C-alpha cells in the first residue's frame, strides 16, 4: 500500500436537501475513527467533510419551504455541524460547495479539462430523475417511468443542449488503472460492480444544465450552470486549501494531495470510482489510492425510508445513549463494507455486554483490589520478568500488529473483536487466578502480577479503542493515573510517547491510580409509552 507521510481522507460532501440521516452519521463515524487511528500513529492527518449544496433538487426544496436556496443550505449545514459535534467527530475541514473559493477552483479545473479537449457542446436527451440529479437508462426504469431508486417519483423527459465530459476517451486508461491498482475500489464486491459497469462501455456525461439557476455558471457559457457532480467532487480539492491561501489548484494540491482515502456509501460509487478518476486523468492529476464504498443500513431488518416512517434519527439516538455508544455499535456490529442492521434491543444488549460488563466491570473490580491490596497504586514488579506465555501477555503482545492491520483495512469490527478477546480473557484470568486467595496466603508477588497484567490489558484495550470510543478511553486512562485526553491529539502527543503506549507492558509500576468509578452506565431500553 502506498504510504505517504501525510494522510487526508474524506467523507462524502453530503447533499443538503434534508437534515442528516443515520447513513451520513455512519460514514462520518467511520471516517473519524480512521482519522483518529492515523493521528494515534503520529501521522499528520486531515479529515474532510462538508456539504454539496447546488442543483435543481435544492432549488425546488427551498422553493417549497419558501426560503432562498442559500438560507435553506445554511440551516441544513448547521444541522450537520451540530450532529458532528454531538458525535464527537474531529473534522479538520468542512467544505461547502457554495463557498466563493470553491468557485475559483472549479473554474480553473474546468478550464484545464476544456484545454485538453475533453469538454464539448452536445444534445442531451433522456429520462432525468431530479432526486438523483442524474439521467436514467430507459431499460432501468420501473413501470410508469419511475426511477428505480426513488420509486415514488416519475422521471422527467429532457431534451436540451448541454456541455459534456468525454468520459469515453478514458475507457482504456481506467481499465488499465483498475488492473494495476486492484485495491483502488474496496471492498471487492464494489470493485466487481464498477468493473462490470465500465466493461459495458462508457458514455460521455453531461456536466451542465440549462434551466437551473442554483449553481456556478459554466466558465465559457454563463447561460448554463455546472452540473452538481462536476462541482461537488471538486469540493474535496477546495477543502485542501489553507485558510489564507489564494484559491488556485497549485495551492490546493501542494501539501495533502493525493487524498489517501475517499469513504462513501455504495450509492455514489460510480461517481467516485469512474467519473472522478477520469476527471483527474483529464486534468493530469495523481489519483487517490483508495475509494471504499460501505453498505446500507436497515432497521429491524427493513429498509429505512420516510415513506415507511421507520427512519432512525441520529440526533435523538446520540442524545439518548451518548456518542461512544453509537460509535461503538455501528463500527463493531456491522462488518464495514457489508449492509448492516440497527435494532434497539440488540444495541442495548451489545453495549451493556461489551462496555458496561466486560470492560467496565473488569476495570472497576481490578482497581478496587488495587486499592485494597496495593494502596491504590500500580503493583510494583519487574514487568520484563512476566513470562511470555502468561495468558494476558501472550495475547497482549500480538495486539498492536493485529489491530493496526485491521484499522488500515477499515475492519473496525475486527478491531473491536480483538480487543474484546483481550478483555474477556482478562475477566476469566482474574476469576481463575483469584488474587483475593493469594492475598490471604500472603503471596504478594502473585497478587502484584495478577493485578498488573489485568490493568495493563485494560489500558492497552483502551488505547486501541480510543479511535472508536474516545471519551470512554479517556476515562479509563484517567482512572489508571494518566492525565491524558484522547480528544486532543496535539496535547496527547505532548503528554505520552504514543509509540510506547501502543504495545503491551507500558503501565508504570507504582503509578498512582484514581478512585474506581463506573466508566459506562448500564443502558436501558426506553419503556413503551402507556397508551
Residue ranges and their predicted role:
Residues 1-6, 46, 122-127, 131, ...:
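Basic, alpha-helical terminal appendages of large translation-related enzymes
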Residues 2-49, 101-105, 156-372, 415-419:
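Structured secondary-structure scaffolds
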Residues 2-14, 19, 31-205, 240-252, ...:
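Conserved, charged catalytic cores of large soluble enzymes
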Residues 182-185, 402-415, 464:
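Short helix-to-loop capping/linker segments positioned immediately adjacent to catalytic or ligand/cofactor-binding
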Residues 339-344, 397-405:
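Short, charged/polar, low-complexity loop and linker segments
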Residues 347, 351, 388, 407, ...:
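Non-transmembrane, amphipathic alpha-helical segments
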Residues 356, 360, 393, 397, ...:
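Generic structural concept
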Residues 375, 413, 506:
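Aromatic-residue-lined binding/catalytic grooves and analogous aromatic/hydrophobic interfacial grooves
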